[in-house]
């Protein structure tokens, strides 16, 4: 009897420990009591949970915002559970309509497969490849007969589909909704049926699709999955969600210097959010950082520098993080120039500044260069230039700077 209660107590302790780790940073768990029950059953039987994440490979470059769910998957892996990444090569032909105000262009098969390879290369910067199963949903969706598709469609209603905000909005505004778009949440939900998933992860904007998975599993006689929704990561501006198109992002393929510098530009009030969602800093240390910032015993600058080191080390190496910090101190705290900067040889004696910036790789276009100049973000040998019509008299060793982190040294021909 003592052994029985001792074993039960240890099991409940482990369930509580795993729940505490898995709750970190989560916006919503539907329902949490099911997750607790699934963890208990997994520990009692020794059978790991199947934890699913679907990736629709429409945008191949991953930024920190995408890694929020990947970090949660990594936690599941470290607790001994099975992670399944579904590359949505079949659903990607539709494109997820979530949050979209109009019908999206369908990707070609070649585009999808190329993007999928890029995704796979990047997700393993966070996930353990040895503990990750990667599969494509065309393996089962592509084999459904038309009769089976009709049967799948019969498992829900148009009224239910119109509960989604984006569909409801488009319907009310008389914007077109293609029938095939209704199939996206159905197909994502059917992925959960095909895999008999125990848990599915997604952003808060994916809640409808994740709950569709629960609904369809129940319809097909399976135990419904738990839906875990992660917050949408705010961008570096602290206003809108992190997005490449908005320019407020940190890409996980960026250089250590760029990654470190961008992190240091983060508003102080977002530091703890980033610590919680995109680093692996233990909960106890996170609590100490929070307490230190609240009491004033930890300077926000020092907390942010550690955050920058953590992020750079995760996607590069600890040594690269320390080197990026050294350069940051050198350039931005001591106002020195970086040791390593792009060099450019110029044949002309005088060059229009916006064109020179494009040649030096400091701006993607002359119009963007003109905007940066007007904003006062451009310096020549440390002197700010605000006239976009400036003609630069090129001198040997001249240093051109755009923003806080981009430099180029000029040489004469």
Swiss-Prot record:
A single Gene Ontology CC term: cytosol
Read off the Pfam families from this record.
S4, tRNA-synt_1b
Q: What is this protein called?
A: Tyrosine--tRNA ligase
**Lineage per the UniProt record:** Bacteria, Bacillati, Bacillota, Clostridia, Moorellales
How would you classify this enzyme at the top EC level?
A: ligase
> At the top level of its lineage, which domain of life is listed?
Bacteria
Q: Which residues bind ATP?
A: 244
| CDD domains for the chain | S4 (cd00165), TyrRS_core (cd00805)
Q: Which PROSITE patterns match?
A: AA_TRNA_LIGASE_I, S4
The primary site where this protein sits is: cytoplasm
- State whether it acts alone or in a complex, and with which partners, per the record: Homodimer.
């Amino acid at each position: 009897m003592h052994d029985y209660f001792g074993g039960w107590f240890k099991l409940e302790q482990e369930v509580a420990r795993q729940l505490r780790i898995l709750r970190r940073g989560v916006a919503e768990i539907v329902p949490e009591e099911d997750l607790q029950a699934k963890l208990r059953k997994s520990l009692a039987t020794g059978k790991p949970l199947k934890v699913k994440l679907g990736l629709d490979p429409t945008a191949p470059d991953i930024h920190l915002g995408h890694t929020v769910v990947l970090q949660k998957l990594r936690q599941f892996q470290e607790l001994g559970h099975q992670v399944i990444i579904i590359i949505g090569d079949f659903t990607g032909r539709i494109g997820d309509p979530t949050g979209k105000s109009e019908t999206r262009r369908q990707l070609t098969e070649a585009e999808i497969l190329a993007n999928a390879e890029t995704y796979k290369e990047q997700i393993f910067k966070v996930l353990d490849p040895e503990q990750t199963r990667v599969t494509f949903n065309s393996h089962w969706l592509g084999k459904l007969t038309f009769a089976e598709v009709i049967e799948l469609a019969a498992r829900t209603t148009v009224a239910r589909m119109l509960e989604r905000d984006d569909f409801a909005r488009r319907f009310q505004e008389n914007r077109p909704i293609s029938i095939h778009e209704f199939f996206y949440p159905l197909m994502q939900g059917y992925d959960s049926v095909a895999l008999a998933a125990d848990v599915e992860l997604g952003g808060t904007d994916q809640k409808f699709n994740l709950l569709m998975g629960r609904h369809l599993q129940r319809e097909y006689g399976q135990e419904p999955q738990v839906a875990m929704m992660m917050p949408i990561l705010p961008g570096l501006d602290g206003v809108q969600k992190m997005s490449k198109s908005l320019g407020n992002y940190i890409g996980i393929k960026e250089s250590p210097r760029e990654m470190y510098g961008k992190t240091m530009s983060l508003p102080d009030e977002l530091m703890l959010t980033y610590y919680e969602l995109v680093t692996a800093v233990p909960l106890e240390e996170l609590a100490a950082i929070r307490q230190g910032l609240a009491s004033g015993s930890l300077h926000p600058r020092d907390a942010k520098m550690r955050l920058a080191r953590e992020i750079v080390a995760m996607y590069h190496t600890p040594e690269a993080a320390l080197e990026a910090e050294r350069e940051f101190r050198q350039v931005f705290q001591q106002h020195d120039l970086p040791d390593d900067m792009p060099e450019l040889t110029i044949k002309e004696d005088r060059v229009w500044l916006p064109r020179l910036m494009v040649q030096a790789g400091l701006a993607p276009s002359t119009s963007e260069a003109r905007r940066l100049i007007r904003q006062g973000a451009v310096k020549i040998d440390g002197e700010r230039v605000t006239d976009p019509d400036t003609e630069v008299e090129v001198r040997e060793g001249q240093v051109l700077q755009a923003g806080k982190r981009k430099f180029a040294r000029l040489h004469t021909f």
